[in-house]
Amino acid sequence: MSQISRDEVAHLARLSRLALTDAELDSFAGQLDAILTHVSQVQAVDVTGVEPTDNPLKDLNVTRPDEPMPCLTQAEALAEAPEAVDGRFAVPQILGDE
């Protein structure tokens, strides 16, 4: 037996402000019924003794320490630039004057 009827799909479509054809209503009813069947199968799985988790990985947001390191001077950074203006990289304009 279907878990969702064509009328229920039509109701959901109206709530969602979707204009569906009769063929689409039939198609979506079948697809949603298949989805709900799969969900029912998942819900039927015995999870007794299984610890709830939202992520199987225990190490989240592992980062290295932030350590100061030597970096280029302004002159060194601009030395290989095709063009520099007032100590900054000069690049072609990509946005309009607006």
From Swiss-Prot:
* Domain of life of the native organism: Bacteria
* UniProt cross-references to PANTHER family, sorted A to Z: GLUTAMYL-TRNA(GLN) AMIDOTRANSFERASE SUBUNIT C, MITOCHONDRIAL
Gene3D superfamilies, per the entry: Glu-tRNAGln amidotransferase C subunit, N-terminal domain (1.10.20.60)
**Source taxonomy:** Bacteria, Bacillati, Actinomycetota, Actinomycetes, Mycobacteriales
Group of enzyme by EC? ligase
Q: Name one GO biological process term.
A: glutaminyl-tRNAGln biosynthesis via transamidation
As recorded in UniProt, its EC number(s) are 6.3.5.-
Q: Give UniProt keywords alphabetically.
A: ATP-binding, Ligase, Nucleotide-binding, Protein biosynthesis
InterPro entries hit by this protein: Asp/Glu-ADT_sf_sub_c (IPR036113), GatC (IPR003837)
Name-wise, this protein is Aspartyl/glutamyl-tRNA(Asn/Gln) amidotransferase subunit C
Quote one Gene Ontology molecular function term.
glutaminyl-tRNA synthase (glutamine-hydrolyzing) activity
Its UniProt entry gives the catalysed reaction(s) as: L-glutamyl-tRNA(Gln) + L-glutamine + ATP + H2O = L-glutaminyl-tRNA(Gln) + L-glutamate + ADP + phosphate + H(+); L-aspartyl-tRNA(Asn) + L-glutamine + ATP + H2O = L-asparaginyl-tRNA(Asn) + L-glutamate + ADP + phosphate + 2 H(+)
Described by its record, this protein's role is as follows: Allows the formation of correctly charged Asn-tRNA(Asn) or Gln-tRNA(Gln) through the transamidation of misacylated Asp-tRNA(Asn) or Glu-tRNA(Gln) in organisms which lack either or both of asparaginyl-tRNA or glutaminyl-tRNA synthetases. The reaction takes place in the presence of glutamine and ATP through an activated phospho-Asp-tRNA(Asn) or phospho-Glu-tRNA(Gln).
Residues in the signal sequence: none
Species per Swiss-Prot/TrEMBL record:
Mycolicibacterium paratuberculosis (strain ATCC BAA-968 / K-10)
According to the record's subunit comment, the protein's assembly and interactions are:
Heterotrimer of A, B and C subunits.
